Amino acid sequence: MYSNPNSFLGGNSQRPGQPQYGNQFGAGAGQPQLQQPGPFAPQPTGFGQQPALQQQYTGYPGLQAPQPTGQLQPQFTGFGQAPQQNVGAAAPPMPAMPQQFQQQFQQQQQQFQQQPQQTSSPFGAAPSQQPPASALAPPAPPMKPQPTGFHEMAASFQTAGGSKSTASAPRKTNKIPNIRLSFITAQDQAKFETLFKSAVGDGQTTMTGEKARDLLLRSRLDGDSLSHIWTLADTTRSGQLHFPEFALAMYLCNLKLTGKTLPEHLPENIKNEVSSMVDIINFSVAEEAANASDSGIRQNTATPPVIQHPQPQPSNSQLLQAQMTGFPSQQTGFLGAQPTGMPQATGYTGPRPPMPPMPTGFGSSLTPNAGPGGMVAPLNAQPTGIPGQWGLVNTPATGLPLIDALQARMMPQQGREQQTYTTAGLQGNAVIPWAITKDEKTRYDSLFRAWDGLHKGYISGDQAIEILGQSGLEKPDLERVWTLADNGNKGRLDMDEFAVAMHLIYRKLNGYPVPNQLPPELVPPSTRNFNQSIGMVKNMLHQESEYRKNSGAALLPQKTGVSYLKGHSFKGAGAGFGNRKDATVFKNNDEEVGYRSSARRRVGNNSPRPESPASVNSSEELSIEQLRKKIKEKQVLLDAMDFADEKHAEEDDILDRRDRREADELYRRIRRIQEDIDNHPDASLISADSDAERRALKRQLQNLTDKIPDLASQVRKTEKAIADARLELFRLRDAKAHPSSAAAIIGTGPGGTVTESDRLKARAKAMMQQRTAALTGKKIEVSNDDLDAPKRLEEESIKIRTEKENNERMVRDVEDSVREFAKGIEDNMKEGAQDSTTEHEKRRWEDGLGVEDEVRDFIYDLQRSSRAARIRSQDRQGGRQPTQEPTRAEAPPSARSVSPAVSRTSTPSAPVAGGGSYSSYKTPEERAAFIKQQAEQRMAERLAALGIKAPTKPGETAAQRMERERAERAAKLRQAEEEDARREAERQARIAEETGAPAPAAQAAVPKPEGKKPPPPPSRKTPKVDDRRAEEEAAARKAEEGRLERERGEQERQTRELEERAKDQEDELAKERAEADARLKALEEQVRQGKLKKEEEKRKKKAAMAEAKEQEAKLAQRRAEIEAARKREEELRKQLEALDVEDSSSDDDEGPEQITPQASTPTLGGSQVGGSQELEPAPPTPVPAPVQSPPQIVTSSPAETESRNPYFRMRAQAAETTPAPPAPPAPVAPPPPPQPDVSTNPFHRMTQAAAAPAPSGPVSRKRPEDDGWGSDKEDDDEDSDDDRPGQGAAHLASILFGTMAPPRPLSATGDKSAAASPPVTSPVASPPPAIPSPTAAGAPPAPPPPPPMPGMGAPPPPPPPPPMPGSGAPAAPPPPPPPAPGGAPPPPPPPPPPPGGAPAPAAPAGGRPAAFLGEIQAGRALRKTQTKDKSGAAVAGRVLD
């Protein structure tokens, strides 16, 4: 930081405002001293106007007599120069001066205790004790260090290091607060402290993420758990762990290891405990940093000084006091002659800067000498700690070489983008201080302003890459420079940070390494001040929290009077938290009335009531008039209080009366609603225990649902048995109809069934016989029945299987519909169920639990009236029941004869029989409809009783549902009106009974005749008149009843007629609907039969066409086989001797592999013809593409990815875009997604590195080996040939035809799944194809089949020379067998295959006319056929008819 390397002062010189006595005494005791040339004249040193400074014992021998010299005598002027060894005379060594030294020590010790800053007092008050002049000796060698005891005294003023200039800084130790963590034991905490200290070392308070990861990985937990543990433990989100956080991490690891679950969030007590201890650690670090001297921070790292604690300074005038002039001198240079009596400029009033240590321990000086001769060497300004003086020093004497060249290169220039910069011309070996000089700062600021054209105040990372890259340094060095300069990882540099970066680059160019950590000299003032501000805020918060905690404000804020008003100040300390008055500390003084708010008793238990201010004045001091006046005032107050109480009582009475009226009104409304509920038609459906009924229904529904799988499995078993029986019946009938086909294939399966292996063996046997006959010239009679039998069996099995699948699908649909219906019913029941809240409310308001007595009595009264009303309604219904029984047998029941639920839920379209009997329905459809209707009605009734809405009928339209609901509402309304009329009549009857008048119940129930007035009230005085009136009323009543009876009969007759008419209409509609359904079913049956017939015709036509084409293909192939057989006849004869035609071993299977021509292709098996519906279309052959190399995915840790260092991103991009070896273009791996939050979790990086996807291998483009073989029902129940060596059709086919070309596409057969296997068009080599499984062969076993067709059905080109198997040639029609290696000319090519992509079927030997074969051999051309391509593209599908 300081540019003057020769200004070495003692360690104690770092203490501002303190004289350097400790170091000087130490120097006198343990360092060689220079000799004093002579005494000094009196000097005004700022300590009063003392006439002369007497000689003092300073640990050095006495001074010589004054000797006039021509040079200025050495003065202590605050500036230390290099020592002059041969100046003046040396004093002789002095062994000991105990008496003087003792007095000097005592005086100094007293003055240090009293005035630590004023150092001139002890010397001014020292006695004038001087040694005799004769004690001075001639010059002698430098004095040796003597053990005078002063070294210990000097050391007492220092913290460590004694007087040695090379003393190191005090060793820091990890200060862990002596606080007990509650979530771990004391033994565990001690272990964790030991482990923490051993891991972080001395001088550190936090553990880095890397060390923490290494320690936590020893637990052998998975990465996810460790990542979660880190997230919980790192409470400060700093990427480092304090000790409490480390202990918490170990505690969480122990939890995980013991099998417990890690919490999602920390408990509050643990979190607060850890945070408090972390704050204590941080505050202790902040306090140490605040107490440490600024000079102790700004030191050269090579020689760390002893950090001293500064003492408070009274004023600037006391910074520099009188200096000791009798000390050993330092040669200040050859200055001009100066009298020794001249005053020296020691009264400098500016703040004294801290001085760097001097390794030799020589005497220190404080201020520069202001003599007239001037100074020999320039003095550098020392940093004073003021923000304006941030680490800036003067330019060293050697200057700043090459700084101009660096500035010129860094300036913005034209065409700089195309230039390549190196360090040539910028490197040097100059001595560069750590601190930034003033000249450097000026240049760097101008450079910053030149680049910051928009005056944004910062330079972004992209600009920094361009600017700093012009220095020519390596990118790793520039990356480290950026990391040091960009404080806080902001991604940009301000002016000071840019100066730091340029200074580091300039030092690097001069041979200095880039440091790992930014030294204190280069910390910008903005960063330092910001950190200090944060520390200040933390200290203030800590002090306030401590104050509140100690004062108990957190527990009783109103009791302690602690203010919550914000009073923080950054300029001065507050007077105290408790000295302010504001609203936050208001507290009602309960002691004024002598009561506590909590206990309601006198303060101080039995202590008397404290005197109030009013009682302080004694009553004796008041006169009688004053007392009367006070009495009158109190009387007025009491009257006012009484008046106020009366007023409040009246208001309360009014409110009580109003509340009573409202309560009575509510009671009346509740009673009315309860009466409506009791008299409602659906009141009888309310069950006392609906929950029990609901549970019973749920159990019944569950039992019915559990029976569904059993029924479905029984149906499936029956369907399977029916299918097996039908297939066996067809096999027997087919064997009876075609006897010759019965012995063609001998079944070896269970029960003699023909398995897949039997068919393959039979086909291989027939093929071998045909080839042998072709080679030997013999004829083998093969009947067409042998070839058609498997085809018929396969067709029948497909038909039976299709019907079985349809039936199974129907069963599944029934199961699904039943489950959905059951689920809907269960959901409706759950919606009507009561939870705990509703159950509590029900018990409260229905059972009267937890309510007031008045409300409970009212509830009980309602329940009693409800029960009475229900009993009366039941009695009334029971009384009317016999009178309506005859009408129920005669006519359909009216709305009153059936239950309300039935009349409400019945549909108008459903026919209703007289009496509801089941026998009235004649047809099964009507009976089924009646049963369904009755079931729906019962279900609706039970659901309505539970309060559940009935589900919508599946076959009911919206209009029908609306009509039904409208009818139900009308019926309900009509019934409610009747009930209201009846209830009103009953009420009038009760009123009449209570008043003693006759009950006019009948008159209230029916409409009264117009003009008739009610009879007058009875009179007790005239009994005869009353009797007469009663007789008249009885006669009128009888007449009225007769009229009403007639009207009722007329209405019932009309109603009966309407119902009969509606019934007839419904019957007619039902008949018409049944006839329409029958006609629709007949038409559907006709359409289905027509479709089946058409499909059968198409199938037969296609089969005939396929057979004809196969015949032609076999005919064309025979010619090629005859030509090939002539050359291999001898070889085949030898092999035929070892063949046993009847044997079914693997020898028969291996024969064709040796004799089959390489260019022949297998015929399509019957399984590909008949079982086309069972085959899944094979995937089309992909277009040939070059093999792609796996993409290289570059993964990085989150810390690297999230760093805003532009050079790091540049290096990462360079690593990603490094050219790989020449390879086909591969898809570029997507960059990792940006993460918004910087994660400092080291385990997060570990898990990301572990989760990086490994590059997959190259994708194979080869055709699958099986190529669809064995896919047509190899898992059939009848196939039990698992113990054969072939293990399936695919293996046997690969043995037989392993060397043949790829198979033809399925489109060549003309079947519905023609696009199942397209031709191989890829240039990639394909494996040898396998023969299709002949489960239901549609063609007879034939000699080697014809060549394959092109995939698109176009006529093929002439056959090229055949490729070797697996060579990857395109699937063109293969030629006849290849020529011999000797070079013999090949035979003529075979005739072109028939167009359309369908092979010609080969006719059986002996089955075709010999003349036709002769004509073909003679060269007769076949008739050109027209292509009718029905297969479409080889890669396209087809729609089945």
Curated annotation (Swiss-Prot):
<feature type="compositionally biased region" description="Pro residues">
    <location>
        <begin position="1340"/>
        <end position="1402"/>
    </location>
</feature>
<feature type="compositionally biased region" description="Polar residues">
    <location>
        <begin position="66"/>
        <end position="87"/>
    </location>
</feature>
<keyword id="KW-0472">Membrane</keyword>
<dbReference type="GO" id="GO:0010008">
    <property type="term" value="C:endosome membrane"/>
</dbReference>
<feature type="compositionally biased region" description="Low complexity">
    <location>
        <begin position="994"/>
        <end position="1008"/>
    </location>
</feature>
<keyword id="KW-1003">Cell membrane</keyword>
<feature type="region of interest" description="Disordered">
    <location>
        <begin position="292"/>
        <end position="316"/>
    </location>
</feature>
<dbReference type="InterPro" id="IPR000261">
    <property type="entry name" value="EH_dom"/>
</dbReference>
<feature type="region of interest" description="Disordered">
    <location>
        <begin position="824"/>
        <end position="845"/>
    </location>
</feature>
<feature type="coiled-coil region">
    <location>
        <begin position="791"/>
        <end position="820"/>
    </location>
</feature>
<dbReference type="InterPro" id="IPR002048">
    <property type="entry name" value="EF_hand_dom"/>
</dbReference>
<feature type="compositionally biased region" description="Basic and acidic residues">
    <location>
        <begin position="1262"/>
        <end position="1272"/>
    </location>
</feature>
<dbReference type="GO" id="GO:0030479">
    <property type="term" value="C:actin cortical patch"/>
</dbReference>
<feature type="compositionally biased region" description="Polar residues">
    <location>
        <begin position="292"/>
        <end position="303"/>
    </location>
</feature>
<feature type="domain" description="EF-hand 1">
    <location>
        <begin position="221"/>
        <end position="256"/>
    </location>
</feature>
<feature type="compositionally biased region" description="Low complexity">
    <location>
        <begin position="1313"/>
        <end position="1324"/>
    </location>
</feature>
<feature type="compositionally biased region" description="Pro residues">
    <location>
        <begin position="1177"/>
        <end position="1189"/>
    </location>
</feature>
<keyword id="KW-0254">Endocytosis</keyword>
<dbReference type="InterPro" id="IPR011992">
    <property type="entry name" value="EF-hand-dom_pair"/>
</dbReference>
<dbReference type="GO" id="GO:0006897">
    <property type="term" value="P:endocytosis"/>
</dbReference>
<keyword id="KW-0967">Endosome</keyword>
<dbReference type="InterPro" id="IPR003124">
    <property type="entry name" value="WH2_dom"/>
</dbReference>
<feature type="coiled-coil region">
    <location>
        <begin position="1028"/>
        <end position="1143"/>
    </location>
</feature>
<dbReference type="GO" id="GO:0005886">
    <property type="term" value="C:plasma membrane"/>
</dbReference>
<feature type="compositionally biased region" description="Low complexity">
    <location>
        <begin position="891"/>
        <end position="911"/>
    </location>
</feature>
<feature type="region of interest" description="Disordered">
    <location>
        <begin position="867"/>
        <end position="1441"/>
    </location>
</feature>
<feature type="coiled-coil region">
    <location>
        <begin position="618"/>
        <end position="735"/>
    </location>
</feature>
<feature type="coiled-coil region">
    <location>
        <begin position="956"/>
        <end position="997"/>
    </location>
</feature>
<feature type="domain" description="EH 1">
    <location>
        <begin position="188"/>
        <end position="277"/>
    </location>
</feature>
<feature type="compositionally biased region" description="Pro residues">
    <location>
        <begin position="1219"/>
        <end position="1236"/>
    </location>
</feature>
<feature type="compositionally biased region" description="Polar residues">
    <location>
        <begin position="604"/>
        <end position="621"/>
    </location>
</feature>
<feature type="compositionally biased region" description="Low complexity">
    <location>
        <begin position="24"/>
        <end position="38"/>
    </location>
</feature>
<keyword id="KW-0963">Cytoplasm</keyword>
<feature type="compositionally biased region" description="Polar residues">
    <location>
        <begin position="1"/>
        <end position="23"/>
    </location>
</feature>
<keyword id="KW-0677">Repeat</keyword>
<comment type="similarity">
    <text>Belongs to the PAN1 family.</text>
</comment>
<dbReference type="GO" id="GO:0016197">
    <property type="term" value="P:endosomal transport"/>
</dbReference>
<feature type="compositionally biased region" description="Basic and acidic residues">
    <location>
        <begin position="1107"/>
        <end position="1137"/>
    </location>
</feature>
<feature type="compositionally biased region" description="Acidic residues">
    <location>
        <begin position="1273"/>
        <end position="1282"/>
    </location>
</feature>
<comment type="subunit">
    <text>Component of the PAN1 actin cytoskeleton-regulatory complex.</text>
</comment>
<feature type="compositionally biased region" description="Acidic residues">
    <location>
        <begin position="1139"/>
        <end position="1152"/>
    </location>
</feature>
<feature type="domain" description="EF-hand 2">
    <location>
        <begin position="473"/>
        <end position="508"/>
    </location>
</feature>
